[in-house]
């Protein structure tokens, strides 16, 4: 088995809904009977839970992805880097005495690709978040060479953030295959005009607009999205 649908989910900033949209993607895939796996490439911010086997660290985003997928992965593959401190990844890694190696993340992805029919890889923070002194998430995306889905957090300033992110994706030789408008600020004035401005300027299709949800559940978000235009999206 080798995955035929693969994508890298990035965003215009941190805390703008990458994980919710990634879980919505996974939900849609699972609903079509696809064996779908998820990788949270780098997770910064974890809580220790005591179990019979000892102390186990959990990250909310990584757990949400695992719950939405239907291919069960070892933690080491699902989250190549699970960092304890909730801060910039390179800082969290340094505090933990860890060096984030893009080659290791790619190796995990290659293994997971053989275990599933679809793989959703979620980045960390925005598209150019430092992972080390020499690499950032853009370098990771380029190394994985996956089509990119961009989550735009709808709030003041999102036009500039979205257009700069799209330019950075193109500068890495990557293909932006779709974008999602996710409402971060429910009181944002002229939100529809902002979405229209982006739709006129981005070559990739708009996959949908997600309102501010009371509970950011995968099925609830997926109801506002249409992924059928994505490359290699499985036929119903």
Curated annotation (Swiss-Prot):
InterPro entries xrefs: DTB_synth_BioD, P-loop_NTPase
UniProtKB keywords: ATP-binding, Biotin biosynthesis, Cytoplasm, Ligase, Magnesium, Metal-binding, Nucleotide-binding
Localization in the cell: Cytoplasm
Metal-binding keyword on record: yes
Gene3D superfamilies in alphabetical order: P-loop containing nucleotide triphosphate hydrolases
Residue positions of the active site: 40
Pathway: Cofactor biosynthesis; biotin biosynthesis; biotin from 7,8-diaminononanoate: step 1/2
Pfam families cross-referenced by the UniProt entry: AAA_26
Cellular component per GO, a single term: cytosol
Residues noted as binding Mg(2+) in the record, renumbered to the chain: 19, 61, 122
GO MF assignments: ATP binding; dethiobiotin synthase activity; magnesium ion binding
Catalysed transformations (reactions): (7R,8S)-7,8-diammoniononanoate + CO2 + ATP = (4R,5S)-dethiobiotin + ADP + phosphate + 3 H(+)
Membrane-crossing segments per the record: none
Its EC number(s): 6.3.3.3
GO biological process: biotin biosynthetic process
Cofactor entry: Mg(2+)
CDD domains linked: DTBS
Residues the record lists as binding ATP: 61, 122-125, 182-183, 211-213
Assembly and binders: Homodimer.
Protein function: Catalyzes a mechanistically unusual reaction, the ATP-dependent insertion of CO2 between the N7 and N8 nitrogen atoms of 7,8-diaminopelargonic acid (DAPA, also called 7,8-diammoniononanoate) to form a ureido ring.
Family as reported in the entry's similarity comment: Belongs to the dethiobiotin synthetase family.
Protein name, UniProt field: ATP-dependent dethiobiotin synthetase BioD
Organism listed in the record: Janthinobacterium sp. (strain Marseille) (Minibacterium massiliensis)
